[in-house]
Structures are given as structure tokens and as C-alpha cells.
Regions:
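Glycine-/small-residue-enriched transmembrane alpha-helix faces in small-molecule transporters
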Residues: 1-38, 75, 79, 83, ...
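Hydrophobic alpha-helical transmembrane segments of multi-pass integral membrane proteins
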Residues: 1-4, 30-53, 68, 124-132, ...
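Membrane-interface helix-cap regions at the ends of transmembrane helices
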Residues: 18, 22, 45-63, 131-145, ...
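Structural motif at transmembrane-helix junctions in multi-pass transporters
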Residues: 25, 33-37, 82-100, 177, ...
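C-terminal transmembrane-helix exit sites in multi-pass transporters
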Residues: 27, 84, 103-125, 256-284
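C-terminal-most transmembrane helix of multi-pass membrane proteins
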Residues: 40, 44, 139-140, 245, ...
Length: 318
């Protein structure tokens, strides 16, 4: 099931770029932060509304641990997506998708630090492969030691996605029901995104203009149904059944789907909406960098990790 979540998230990368292109056609003076806020707010309002209709009474009888987890997941996710979506406007969909996977390195290292235990050799080898892949994919300049804005923001977003995965791994949340947690997460994310609209909008009167565009609404609906409701429901339901390290590395499949879809979806989106978003191509950097990151995931799956005990409440609060 987590593979299906990766398919949906892979679709989100070309979709988000398409929404940004359509937004700029409608409101050319918009900042990238305002564009990001306008992507996120309707996405999570729709997701919360659909879930509340589909699962009536989902929020009834929520326990304190479910509330804490829902709010925590929302905060990690919304901050991560703000940086990821803004960064995606300054780099390609494929590059963003692969760089997001830096949490594949951070999760085992973080768990080792918290538990004062060294990860097995296979984790270190995989980490080196991912680091090399990131350097190649981002065209890292070793002389100036600089990355572009899009790449930096994407790497920052990965820190928050790591926090989201680790929160699902906590033992004090093991008995939580995934549906109420997911619905609350969507509501908190929607509220945060609306605050961001208020802060970044040149004029609030500009916002309704977006809803006059059939392509913008269509892209947003697809992002909501597949990449939000579908992907997050699957993640919150199935990811707690495996270790955080295994989950982080399984999610390395996401950029493979994103890169594949970025080869043909931009042209289809452009034809429908009337903007110029060219199909991406398989460059040497993408093949080598993406291949190294994918190899790290394959290595972990071929040689499975010993299952670590999830973080206890005391460990999580340290």
C-alpha cells in the first residue's frame, strides 16, 4: 500500500508545477510564497470536507493522544510542504522529488543518536549513496559550496517530513485511529495555509480569481483526491506497521514515479491549460543522481534492517 502512496506523491510534483504556471497566468504579480499558500489552502479544505462527509463523526470521541498526533503531523507536514512547494518553483519536478528523499539518511542517523546505538553498515553505505546522489542531482558546486534556492528549500522540507515519519513511529500513538488523526491533520493544515494567504497575498480580492480557471480547479482537485486524501490516508494507516527507517527508504520510490510522470504529463497539462511547461528529459545528472538514491533503497530492501523498538514517550520528549 505504501507503494501506491508513492505513486500519488509522485504525481504531485508535476501537478504542483502546473498549478504554479496556471496561477502566474491568472495573477502574474504573485510571489512564490503566495502561490504556495494558494496551492495548500484549498487542497486541505477540500480534503477535510470530503473526509468529514465520507466518514461522518470522524472527530467524535478523539482521545488526547489522537489530538496530539494529528496536530503534530499537521505542523510537520505543512511546514515541509511550504518549503517543498515553494522550492519546486525554482527547480525541476524530478530533482525536487529525489532531493526530498534526504530523510532516508536522516531517519537512521537520528534514531541512532537518540538511542546511542550505531546503525548497521548497510545503513551507512546507503547514506553515502544518497549523499552522492544528492550532490550529482543538485549539480552541487564544490568550489563555491552552494546550492540553488529550489534545492535548499527542498532539503529543508525533508527535515520536516522526517519529523512526520518519526511521529507515526512513536509507541504512545500506536493505538490511535488513523481516520480521525488524518482529518484533524487536514483541518490544522488548512488553517495554517489560510493564515499564510493572509500574510502573503498582495490583495485578498485576488484569491477568487483563481477559482474562475477550470484548469486551476482541475489540478487542485486532482492534488486533493489523489495526493492528499489518498496518499496521507494510506501513510497514516500503513506506515506504523513498519519501522521508521524502512518507511523512509521505501518512500525513495516516490521520485521514480515523479520522474517518469514528468516525462509526459507537463506536455498534457500545457496543452489543456495553455501555458508553457515542457516535458522533462532524462539527463545524465538525473540518471546518475537518481540511480544512486534508488540504489540505496534497493540495498536496504535486499538486506533488511533489524527491527528497532519504536521511540518511547520518554525518548520522544528528550
Amino acid at each position: 500500500m505504501l507503494v501506491l502512496a508513492n505513486v500519488f506523491w509522485g504525481l504531485s510534483f508535476p501537478l504542483i508545477k502546473a498549478i504554479a504556471f496556471e496561477h502566474l497566468q491568472l495573477l502574474p504579480a504573485s510571489s512564490s510564497w503566495f502561490i504556495t499558500a494558494c496551492m495548500l489552502a484549498p487542497r486541505f479544505v477540500l480534503a477535510a470536507a470530503i473526509m468529514l462527509v465520507w466518514r461522518r463523526g470522524a472527530l467524535r470521541g478523539m482521545t488526547p493522544p489522537e489530538i496530539r498526533q494529528g496536530v503534530g503531523l499537521a505542523l510537520f507536514a505543512i511546514v515541509g510542504m511550504v518549503f517543498q512547494n515553494d522550492g519546486l518553483q525554482y527547480t525541476s519536478a524530478s530533482t525536487s522529488a529525489f532531493l526530498t528523499q534526504i530523510y532516508a539518511i536522516l531517519i537512521p542517523l537520528w534514531l541512532a543518536l537518540r538511542r546511542r546505538r550505531l546503525p548497521p553498515a548497510v545503513v551507512w553505505i546507503s547514506c553515502l549513496l544518497v549523499l552522492a546522489g544528492v550532490a550529482v542531482l543538485a549539480r552541487f558546486d564544490w568550489r563555491d559550496l552552494k546550492l540553488g534556492r529550489g534545492e535548499i528549500e527542498t532539503l529543508v522540507s525533508s527535515l520536516f517530513f522526517m519529523g512526520q515519519i518519526l511521529m507515526l513511529d512513536r509507541t504512545d500513538f500506536a493505538s490511535n485511529r488513523p481516520v480521525p488523526v488524518t482529518v484533524l491533520m487536514f483541518i490544522v493544515e488548512a488553517a495554517a495555509a489560510f493564515v499564510m494567504i493572509g500574510v502573503t497575498a498582495p490583495r485578498l480580492a485576488d484569491v477568487p480569481v483563481l477559482f474562475t480557471s477550470v484548469p486551476w480547479v482541475g489540478f487542485t482537485m486532482a492534488l486533493t483526491l489523489f495526493c492528499t486524501i489518498g496518499a496521507f490516508t494510506i501513510m497514516n494507516t500503513w506506515q506504523p506497521r513498519i519501522t521508521a527507517t524502512e518507511a523512509g527508504l521505501i518512500y525513495c520510490l516516490e521520485p521514480l514515479f515523479a520522474s517518469f510522470m514528468a516525462l509526459f504529463l507537463p506536455g498534457l497539462f500545457s496543452h489543456w491549460a495553455g501555458f508553457a511547461y515542457p516535458n522533462e528529459t532524462l539527463t545524465a545528472n538525473l540518471l546518475v543522481g537518481g540511480g544512486l538514491i534508488t540504489a540505496a533503497n534497493v540495498l536496504i530492501q535486499v538486506k533488511p534492517l533489524p527491527r528497532l523498538t519504536p521511540l518511547t514517550p520518554a525518548e520522544a520528549r528528550r
